[in-house]
Curated annotation (Swiss-Prot):
Location of the region described as Disordered in the Swiss-Prot/TrEMBL record: 53-82
Free-text function comment from the UniProt entry: RNA-dependent RNA polymerase which is responsible for replication and transcription of virus RNA segments. The transcription of viral mRNAs occurs by a unique mechanism called cap-snatching. 5' methylated caps of cellular mRNAs are cleaved after 10-13 nucleotides by PA. In turn, these short capped RNAs are used as primers by PB1 for transcription of viral mRNAs. During virus replication, PB1 initiates RNA synthesis and copy vRNA into complementary RNA (cRNA) which in turn serves as a template for the production of more vRNAs.
Protein's cellular compartments: Host nucleus; Host cytoplasm
Entry-linked HAMAP family: INFV_RDRP (MF_04065)
This protein's record includes keyword Transferase: yes
Encoding gene per record: PB1
EC assignment: 2.7.7.48
InterPro entries, A to Z: RNA-dir_pol_NSvirus (IPR007099), RNA_pol_PB1_influenza (IPR001407)
Protein name: RNA-directed RNA polymerase catalytic subunit
Length: 757
């Protein structure tokens, strides 16, 4: 059937067709090679925006540092980072005046969090810069390595298990004259293979102790590792993102906790809420501006874009904000919160892997590590790279670049939102003291500004004043990329507003289709995505029905499980046909076993096993869901599982789907070609953690697991839990006296061993 595409849009307002312009179909672009060039761009740009600031030298590390705070006010529209301290403090004071008690209350909430947070909070998150190995690691491993090194250097406050105590160790570690670390390394030997008589390379993994003096340790503690941001759609150029080490993470977490608590109380903040809640918040602000501008005023909205938000923010400004927001709080609390911005003012950016060179004529490839960029002859590089290296050289120390100004992506989203909202707050008539006034929305670097005034001149004046106010706080509204419209049509964080929010369906496209976890999860996720889009994204019944049929088709193709009565030949069709013929009630077979699809848009909320349970043959039920069947027993049965969805914007989100453990919920094994590399020692550590955590979960199944209050180690918790459970089981007659005594004996032995340790 041929469709003339223009017919699709005849009755659709232009805004509703916005979906079709988004770059969300197909694979997103990934980066290859090193991020060194992108990182140098970031460092150079950041310094350029602050170039008229004051240069100083860090006394501990010798790093040159540029401080643009209270620098000269810009005379043109170029982006700049010269925030004025007194202006920022005044904006904070006005924010507090409009929201009495906001800082005080948020501080009280945060103090409670600080005292209760366990150090395992830092195991969340994926890649983390591991300063002990000088490269990226999974967060849990990086934390473990840090704690291990701390303990071997006599720093033991962290043993309490509280995050605040771990941070005490971090502070102490910075005063130490030297730190001893264990590094993994790899030895290669050429040996003759006894069987084949060929020479082979044998690799052995070793650990060796290394001492870092105070300067080297501080550089590592203040380092942010950089990588290229992958899978960014709609951009030609890649860009660098940073991942901080464990010394910085805990402090950042507490600052962001305070800022999050403040954002929750600000009606103009687009964080930390999301989805429908965010849309409701937005709609409220728009409604407020529309109702107040009925007869005498006109109202315009700017869909705003800021130039290089992160690179013009400054940690010193954040320090001023924190100092103000916590001014009546206990000294210890103010100190804890001020450390993150201080560390960021002294941060170092690791330049990544370096450059790859290849000589076509000599068939040679070689890598120039970042450490060599400081003194390598520049004749090997092309012009643009040469300029980059020349500009960055004065800032280099041991392969890292001193980067005092700027914030790096994604570190202080909440706190920078507070800064943005403080300007929106100044738009009230009692502050503008004139006929125009403004309000708006801020979510990290994205904003929408609504200006009301009696006439166009007033609107222009209001926008100009907003623009200049932003400059005073180191925020640069881009005149090229922002556009203004009559209120009622604007875009904010990829939500399109036209007298109400228009569904931007293309955002959801990447999550349709078969996820590739396993047959059971994929079926469940597939129908859940369709259900969610019917609820949230204007996916109509006819389209949903079509999406469902396409999904089933895709699913059958992926898992080669076409219906038992089909003519299609696949690797599985022989087995599936056999099962089809043996089955009395064919409707009871799961789609993944060659059964028919019983889903329609009315029953998407029911897991397939439940939908078909009554229709199944008894022996099929017995095979499918029998815990004694070795293909089922590995799965703990939980009612809800989480899948990680990659939405179009924002971080990966967790999507819940109903999970019924069956023979189809298998877990694939990971490829372990890692075993003969220097990662192997790390892997063994990781497996040890995995085992400990699995054991712990056996004692505390998720349903009964409450965060341990008070300070007890994992072992103590498990022993006391074992004793309680054993007593209950013994008293209710589930276990015999001998078993009970044996359990008690084992518990005592474990405690004895701990005492001896």
């Amino acid at each position: 059937m041929d469709v003339n595409p223009t017919l699709l849009f005849l009755k659709v307002p232009a805004q509703n067709a916005i979906s079709t312009t988004f770059p969300y179909t197909g694979d997103p672009p990934y980066s290859h090679g090193t991020g060194t060039g992108y990182t140098m761009d970031t460092v150079n740009r950041t310094h350029q925006y602050s170039e008229r600031g004051r240069w100083t030298t860090n006394t501990e590390t010798g790093a040159p540092q540029l401080n643009p705070i209270d620098g000269p006010l810009p005379e043109d529209n170029e982006p700049s980072g010269y925030a004025q301290t007194d202006c920022v403090l005044e904006a904070m004071a006005f924010l507090e005046e409009s929201h009495p008690g906001i800082f005080e209350n948020s501080c009280i909430e945060t103090m409670e969090v600080v005292q209760q947070t366990r150090v395992d909070k830092l195991t969340q998150g994926r890649q983390t810069y591991d300063w002990t190995l000088n490269r990226n690691q999974p967060a849990a491993t990086a934390l473990a390595n840090t704690i291990e090194v701390f303990r071997s250097n006599g720093l033991t406050a962290n043993e309490s298990g509280r995050l605040i105590d771990f941070l005490k160790d971090v502070m102490e570690s910075m005063d130490k004259e030297e730190m001893e670390i264990t590094t993994h390394f790899q030895r290669k030997r050429r040996v003759r293979d006894n069987v084949t008589k060929k020479m082979v390379t044998q690799r052995t993994i070793g650990k060796r102790k290394q001492r870092l003096n105070k300067r080297s340790y501080l550089i590592r503690a203040l380092t942010l590792n950089t990588m290229t941001k992958d899978a960014e759609r709609g951009k030609l150029k890649r860009r660098a993102i940073a991942t901080p080490g464990m010394q910085i993470r805990g402090f950042v977490y507490f600052v962001e906790t305070l800022a999050r608590s403040i954002c929750e109380k600000l009606e103009q903040s687009g964080l930390p809420v999301g989805g429908n809640e965010k849309k409701a918040k937005l709609a409220n602000v728009v409604r407020k501006m529309m109702t107040n501008s009925q007869d005498t005023e006109i109202s315009f909205t700017i869909t705003g874009d800021n130039t290089k938000w992160n690179e013009n923010q400054n940690p010193r400004m954040f320090l001023a904000m924190i100092t103000y927001m916590t001014r009546n709080q206990p000294e210890w609390f103010r100190n804890v919160l001020s450390i993150a911005p201080i560390m960021f003012s002294n941060k170092m950016a690791r330049l990544g892997k370096g450059y790859m060179f290849e000589s076509k004529s000599m068939k040679l490839r070689t890598q120039i590590p970042a450490e060599m960029l400081a003194n390598i002859d520049l004749k090997y590089f092309n012009d643009s790279t040469r300029k980059k290296i020349e500009r960055i050289r004065p800032l280099l120390i041991d392969g890292t670049a001193s980067l005092s100004p700027g914030m790096m992506m994604g570190m202080f989203n909440m706190l920078s939102t507070v800064l943005g909202v403080s300007i929106l707050n100044l738009g009230q008539k009692r502050y503008t003291k004139t006929t125009y006034w403004w309000d708006g929305l801020q979510s990290s670097d994205d904003f929408a500004l609504i200006v009301n005034a009696p006439n166009h001149e007033g609107i222009q004046a209001g926008v100009d004043r907003f623009y200049r106010t932003c400059k005073l706080l180191g925020i640069n509204m881009s005149k090229k990329k922002s556009y203004i419209n009559r209120t009622g049509t604007f875009e904010f964080t990829s939500f399109f507003y036209r007298y109400g929010f228009v569904a931007n369906f293309s955002m959801e496209l990447p999550s349709f289709g078969v996820s590739g976890i396993n047959e059971s999860a994929d079926m469940s996720i597939g129908v859940t995505v369709i259900k969610n889009n019917m609820i949230n994204n204007d996916l109509g019944p006819a389209t949903a029905q079509m999406a469902l049929q396409l999904f089933i088709k895709d699913y059958r193709y992926t898992y080669r499980c076409h219906r038992g009565d089909t003519q299609i030949q696949t690797r599985r069709s022989f087995e599936i046909k056999k099962l089809w013929e043996q089955t009395r009630s064919k409707a009871g077979l799961l789609v993944s076993d060659g059964g028919p699809n019983l889903y329609n848009i009315r029953n998407l909320h029911i897991p397939e096993v439940c939908l078909k349970w009554e229709l199944m043959d008894e022996d099929y039920q017995g095979r499918l869901c029998n815990p004694l069947n070795p293909f089922v027993s590995h799965k703990e049965i939980e009612s809800v599982n989480n899948a990680v969805m990659m939405p179009a914007h924002g971080p990966a989100k967790n999507m819940e789907y109903d999970a019924v453990a069956t023979t189809h919920s298998w877990i694939p094994k990971r490829n372990r070609s890692i075993l003969n590399t220097s990662q192997r020692g790390i892997l063994e550590d990781e497996q040890m953690y995995q085992r400990c955590c699995n054991l712990f979960e056996k004692f505390f199944p998720s349903s009964s697991y409450r965060r341990p209050v008070g300070i007890s180690s994992m072992v103590e918790a498990m022993v006391s839990r074992a004793r309680i459970d054993a007593r209950i089981d013994f008293e209710s007659g589930r276990i015999k006296k001998e078993e009970f005594t044996e359990i008690m004996k084992i518990c005592s032995t474990i405690e004895e061993l701990r005492r001896q340790k």
